[in-house]
Amino acid sequence: MKKFLLISLIFIASLASAKTPQWVKNPSKVYPSKDFFTAVGSGKNQQQAELAAVENLAAIFGRSVRSSAKTSSRMQQAQKDGTVSVGKNSDFSQSITQKVAVEDLIGIELKEYYTDEKKHYALAVMDKKETEKILVASIRANDAKVEKLVCAKPSDLYSLETYARYDYAREIASLDEKMLSKLEVINSETAKGLKNIYSSASVRSQMLDIAKMIPIYLNIEGDLDGQIKQYVSEMFSQFGFRVSDMKEERYGFTGTADFVQRIPEDKKTVQCLYSFKGQLKDVNFLETMWAVSFEGRESSTEEKGLSRRISKALASKVSGEVFSSFEGFLSSLRTE
């Protein structure tokens, strides 16, 4: 009886251990490393396991996974409608596509799932040959797109639309470089044959040459010691544009600032309410191309401290909200 019980326990234990798929601990046994890249992810639920598996597989290529939020809306739309090629990805859950950029998902498939008493497991797999084909085709298609963008002959070379077109080309070239880096890990010989693609650095250099020839008239009324004008000027410089004091320039950015100081009834602090509205116009078409505004409030126990806080707040608003808004505006301009 004891012998029978012992045999039964051993049999049950062996069944329990057999339930854990081989791929959980050794995925290359199921998907040979000669043909596949694999990575296992685990988590408290299936979504966590899937995301971990995808991120672990992307890490094989020696770089951290980019958030999809860092991809411009222009590029996201171009990838969605097929204007920019990234191959055809699997249907990933929203929890993955919101956190991982499309180019990091190329070639990845979630193939296996397993759950034990403690965790959920997922296996991400990449077929090397199939992914190589996807990357080569995408890089070539995108490079042709870049060439078309930079070789187009616009009616007005020194315009914001032309600048935006080169910026779009730079984004596509940058995407190609990321895919080429991935291809180098999969097949370095194939990657060598694509080394003559447009570089994002060379396209950016051409873009900045154009920007230097696009002066923007800048004037801010009601400014506080010229601070907003200074911060906006620095912002335009980051995009490569130069600021001018000549009203006759084609592009002009004008704004109005308002500062209201007040002392609360307790007289313990000094407060300042501030607001700003600005707009960029193209005098050739007498239209407002871009408008931006912000407001805020600062307080301090003494006026000098209040001035410092306001200055810091204005710098933060321009480098944050205004910069992002202008960047989005440039991305919205027609590039075709």
Task: Go through each PLM region and give its residues.
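Hydrophobic h-region of N-terminal signal peptides that target proteins for export
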Residues: 9-17
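Positively charged n-region of N-terminal signal peptides that target proteins for export
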Residues: 1-4
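Domain-level marker for long, solvent-exposed, non-transmembrane regions
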Residues: 18-336
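A ubiquitous, low-specificity "background" feature that marks scattered single residues
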Residues: 8-9, 288
